Design a protein with these regions (language model features):
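Expand to "…catalyze enediolate/carbanion chemistry for C-C bond making/breaking, isomerization
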Residues: 1-219
Length: 219
């Protein structure tokens, strides 16, 4: 059984990455503690077919990684989730990261996932998350939905939330120095007392070790 602490610092990888398959089987000590293979906003529409071919090639091989890092797929939409679920070897992944998760979008994903053995990580990255009522409605939906027990953690979509504010992360600036620095504690107070863990916002400046260190301390 995977625990949310097993995620540690998840590595987002575009599913069309040329080393998607080979990189996950390297034995030189560079493997990530967990992987999220993304087919959503890291790809353009024209890049999706290659991404699907690579995922289809990778899935059966994951059976050889017993005890290895958890692997999640981030589908672009419900149609791609359906396609993933029909692929050979899909049982070898840990679960799915659900983009743009709110009370309007989650029911369609639930229709496909309830009753299956996958863990899910909804991403909080829509306009409703800024509103207290929107956060409460999402929490109550998860509490009563059969999908709720499958939630491993809630992810905070920092870049998308900043985009909704007309902002963009700047080099050297921590997410906690942006308006999201006041939103993140509100998310914690809304969800964590009810048993829902939250992950830290992805730090996309991997070449800035000081920034990564500061964000990890705040997380």
């Amino acid at each position: 059984m995977v625990d949310y602490t097993d995620l540690r610092a998840s590595l987002y990888v575009p599913a069309n990455h040329p080393k998607l398959v080979s990189g996950m089987f390297e034995s030189n000590g560079t493997q990530a503690p967990s992987y999220i293979l993304c087919t959503e906003d890291s790809l353009s529409d024209s890049e999706v077919p290659l991404a699907l071919r690579q995922v289809s090639s990778l899935l059966p091989k994951l059976a050889k990684r017993n005890g290895a890092a958890p692997v999640f797929l981030r589908p672009r939409n419900v149609d791609l989730l359906r396609e993933f679920l029909n692929m050979d070897g899909i049982e070898n992944i840990t679960g799915f990261v659900i983009p743009k998760a709110d009370v309007d979008t989650l029911p369609s994903y639930a229709d496909l996932l309830v009753g299956r053995p996958y863990r899910i990580m909804p991403v909080l990255e829509t306009r409703s998350i800024f509103d207290e009522r929107g956060r409460t409605e999402l929490r109550e939906y998860l509490n009563r939905s059969p999908l709720g027990p499958a939630v491993l953690a809630l992810r905070i979509g920092g870049n998308d939330l900043l985009k909704l504010l007309g902002l963009k992360r700047q080099p050297g600036i921590s997410i906690y120095q942006t308006p999201l620095g006041t939103l993140i504690p509100q998310l914690m107070m809304c969800f964590r007392p009810h048993g829902y863990q939250l992950t830290g916002v992805v730090c996309d400046s991997l070449d800035d070790a000081d920034l990564l260190r500061r964000e990890a301390q705040m997380d």
